[in-house]
């Protein structure tokens, strides 16, 4: 009987992943990472629901105290990023350094198996042509989470199973009801676990970053207003700027050195290219020449045509230049740019600078 360790957050998706694998005859072991204290999908409430699920399914449940790991890799990462005037993407960082990597390591060394599973909506397939594991979009494009998984390497992909990748969210809910899981009607998490625990990103950051009032200026340096901290803003932001103007204003740049927020019209926030660092080529080997693909510069952004120009062929950690077919709005350094060939996730990296 194949043994698999299932990451359990206490939500309906991971619950169905565990239950469905057991239905298929797998020896299932539940594993919950204790990431932080307080309310939230991956916090104390989730631990209780995960424990209840394992009792209902009659499977072992392991809890790993990952609070220090989460603090060092995610909280520090976020705080340092916002202090530098960038907008970090914690989910992809968390998936690789806090969740998948440590989970697979724990499974191999403590539970004698080399297979883990989660409730993510994505798919993995091995390509004989490329001689590597490929990451694919989920069947349910509205729930597809492959964007947040672009940084997983071949070792992690080879040991991971996504039971929900071929299902829609509606089907998952139906399966939860049919399996009589107590999480079947549990509301879906709407925000980052940090936001759920603290109410807002601003509230969370204010615990770690001292507020320093500064100026809100236009691109000519004219003072239009004042702010209470650069870390309260992100590029592309329109609401909550606090400046009255005859036309809509957007945050187009942040200057933490001068403690300034620069605003302008929407056209100013449109960019034709950007640089990407810490590139991870997932489904193909790092190309030597420019390639064409479709890219997402935000999780919910519409994919757009792009030319990817390698600047450093070595992976991971290489750099590329992205040249967009259509100008992109609100590109924020620190966020991820992820490129696809139809449903195949080719690679991705961290947006570094734009022009």
Swiss-Prot record:
Name of the top EC class for this enzyme: transferase
Q: Which SUPFAM superfamilies match?
A: Adenine nucleotide alpha hydrolases-like (SSF52402)
UniProt record, GO biological process: tRNA wobble position uridine thiolation
UniProt keyword annotation of Nucleotide-binding present: yes
Location relative to the cell: Cytoplasm
Q: Which UniProt keywords apply?
A: ATP-binding, Cytoplasm, Disulfide bond, Nucleotide-binding, RNA-binding, Transferase, tRNA processing, tRNA-binding
- Region of interest (Interaction with tRNA), ranges: 143-145, 298-299
The entry assigns this protein to a family as follows: Belongs to the MnmA/TRMU family.
Record's protein name:
tRNA-specific 2-thiouridylase MnmA
Q: What organism is this sequence from?
A: Acaryochloris marina (strain MBIC 11017)
Q: Which gene encodes it?
A: mnmA
